[in-house]
Design a protein with these regions (language model features):
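Basic/polar N-terminal segments that are highly enriched at the extreme N-terminus
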Residues: 1-21, 167-176
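Residues that flank catalytic or metal-binding motifs in active/ligand-binding sites
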Residues: 21, 64, 88
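Short loop/turn microsegments at loop-to-beta-strand junctions
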Residues: 24, 63-64, 116-118
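Core segments of cupin and vicinal oxygen chelate
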Residues: 27-72
Length: 176
């Protein structure tokens, strides 16, 4: 992280109890770390911004570092200039129990229609997300290769995943 003078806001003494996650996703933004953290925490339940620090006088100017949680999962974000961009090689998977939940996250997050495919979308910051039904994990573990092939054929044609259509493909309904 760049050296510089620090200003802390919302800072509270942290007592390390050993419950700190081993891995925390860290997102690099040009200038939008605070804005993005507010956006994401407004969408997911059990979410909050836990700390914001501004480091002054860095080579990129002022640098914001934001700690936040999405559905209890810790994240960090940094505003450190336009050196790096998000791409599809990294995405966050959101497991959804209902079609309504899939529809909700899709509507809130999707900002690049041409990037929508097979349950994947891209948000207004360029970050990729996979919005998937929770049942997909069990479906894809099935040992019946014909079922897996039907489900795969179905979801490859979809943008936003449709639970009813995936279940229909899994059961073979409509197939001769």
């Amino acid at each position: 992280m760049p050296a510089g003078n620090q200003t802390r806001t919302n800072a509270k003494p942290q007592i390390h109890t050993g419950n700190i996650p081993k891995i925390t996703p860290h997102l690099w933004f040009d200038k939008e770390a605070k804005e993005a953290a507010k956006f994401y925490t407004s969408i997911f339940p059990n979410s909050k911004i836990t700390n914001t620090t501004t480091i002054h006088d860095t080579p990129s100017g002022d640098c914001d570092v934001v700690s936040f949680e999405l559905s209890g999962q810790p994240f960090m974000a940094i505003s450190a200039g336009p050196l790096f961009k998000f791409n599809e090689s990294i995405s966050f998977m959101v497991s959804c129990d209902t079609q309504e939940e899939i529809d909700y996250y899709w509507q809130k997050l999707s900002a690049v229609p041409e990037a929508e495919q097979c349950g994947w979308l891209k948000d207004k910051y360029g970050l990729s997300w996979q919005i998937v039904p929770a049942i997909m994990d069990e479906i894809m573990k099935d040992k019946d290769e014909k079922k897996i092939a039907r489900v795969t054929e179905a979801f490859l044609k979809m943008k936003k995943l449709d639970i009813a259509e995936l279940k229909k493909a899994y059961s073979g309904a409509g197939k001769r």
